Amino acid sequence: MSEIQALLGALTGLPRTRPAGPAEAEVLLARLRSAAARWADVLYEAHEGAYGHLPPRAEAALTLAFRRAEESYVELEIALRDCAEHRDPAR
Protein backbone atom coordinates (compact mmCIF):
# COMPACT_ATOMS: atom_id res chain seq x y z
CA MET A 1 0.00 0.00 0.00
CA SER A 2 2.04 2.90 -1.28
CA GLU A 3 -0.85 5.20 -0.36
CA ILE A 4 -0.02 4.64 3.30
CA GLN A 5 3.47 6.01 2.72
CA ALA A 6 1.98 9.00 0.90
CA LEU A 7 -0.44 9.55 3.80
CA LEU A 8 2.38 9.40 6.33
CA GLY A 9 4.32 11.91 4.26
CA ALA A 10 1.32 14.24 4.16
CA LEU A 11 0.82 13.93 7.91
CA THR A 12 4.46 14.48 8.80
CA GLY A 13 4.44 17.56 6.58
CA LEU A 14 1.80 19.23 8.76
CA PRO A 15 3.12 22.16 10.78
CA ARG A 16 3.64 21.50 14.46
CA THR A 17 2.62 25.00 15.52
CA ARG A 18 -0.57 26.99 15.14
CA PRO A 19 -0.86 29.22 12.09
CA ALA A 20 0.40 32.75 12.76
CA GLY A 21 -1.96 34.33 10.25
CA PRO A 22 -4.32 33.83 7.32
CA ALA A 23 -1.60 32.76 4.87
CA GLU A 24 -0.29 30.06 7.19
CA ALA A 25 -3.85 28.93 7.94
CA GLU A 26 -4.50 28.55 4.22
CA VAL A 27 -1.32 26.50 3.82
CA LEU A 28 -2.49 24.30 6.70
CA LEU A 29 -5.86 23.78 5.00
CA ALA A 30 -4.10 22.79 1.78
CA ARG A 31 -1.95 20.25 3.59
CA LEU A 32 -4.95 18.88 5.47
CA ARG A 33 -6.82 18.55 2.17
CA SER A 34 -3.92 16.55 0.77
CA ALA A 35 -3.88 14.30 3.84
CA ALA A 36 -7.66 13.82 3.58
CA ALA A 37 -7.30 12.78 -0.06
CA ARG A 38 -4.57 10.31 0.85
CA TRP A 39 -6.71 8.88 3.68
CA ALA A 40 -9.62 8.42 1.27
CA ASP A 41 -7.26 6.61 -1.12
CA VAL A 42 -6.09 4.29 1.68
CA LEU A 43 -9.68 3.45 2.63
CA TYR A 44 -10.62 2.87 -1.01
CA GLU A 45 -7.71 0.47 -1.51
CA ALA A 46 -8.59 -1.33 1.73
CA HIS A 47 -12.19 -1.68 0.62
CA GLU A 48 -11.20 -3.00 -2.80
CA GLY A 49 -8.77 -5.48 -1.24
CA ALA A 50 -11.21 -6.71 1.40
CA TYR A 51 -14.28 -6.86 -0.84
CA GLY A 52 -15.95 -10.23 -0.52
CA HIS A 53 -13.88 -11.19 2.52
CA LEU A 54 -15.81 -9.22 5.13
CA PRO A 55 -19.28 -9.64 6.57
CA PRO A 56 -21.87 -7.30 5.01
CA ARG A 57 -21.94 -4.82 7.91
CA ALA A 58 -18.15 -4.61 7.97
CA GLU A 59 -18.10 -3.91 4.23
CA ALA A 60 -20.79 -1.27 4.69
CA ALA A 61 -18.79 0.34 7.51
CA LEU A 62 -15.67 0.47 5.34
CA THR A 63 -17.67 1.99 2.49
CA LEU A 64 -19.11 4.59 4.84
CA ALA A 65 -15.66 5.41 6.21
CA PHE A 66 -14.44 5.96 2.64
CA ARG A 67 -17.39 8.23 1.84
CA ARG A 68 -16.79 10.28 4.98
CA ALA A 69 -13.13 10.64 4.08
CA GLU A 70 -14.17 11.87 0.63
CA GLU A 71 -16.58 14.33 2.25
CA SER A 72 -13.75 15.64 4.44
CA TYR A 73 -11.68 16.25 1.33
CA VAL A 74 -14.57 18.11 -0.32
CA GLU A 75 -15.18 20.26 2.77
CA LEU A 76 -11.52 21.23 2.88
CA GLU A 77 -11.63 22.04 -0.84
CA ILE A 78 -14.60 24.33 -0.18
CA ALA A 79 -12.73 25.96 2.70
CA LEU A 80 -9.73 26.61 0.47
CA ARG A 81 -11.93 28.09 -2.24
CA ASP A 82 -13.48 30.38 0.37
CA CYS A 83 -10.02 31.49 1.48
CA ALA A 84 -9.08 32.30 -2.12
CA GLU A 85 -12.29 34.28 -2.64
CA HIS A 86 -11.77 36.15 0.62
CA ARG A 87 -8.17 36.94 -0.33
CA ASP A 88 -9.12 38.04 -3.86
CA PRO A 89 -12.82 39.06 -4.01
CA ALA A 90 -12.62 39.62 -7.81
CA ARG A 91 -12.20 35.85 -8.37
For each predicted feature, which ranges?
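Hydrophobic alpha-helical segments that drive targeting, anchoring, or assembly
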Residues: 1-88
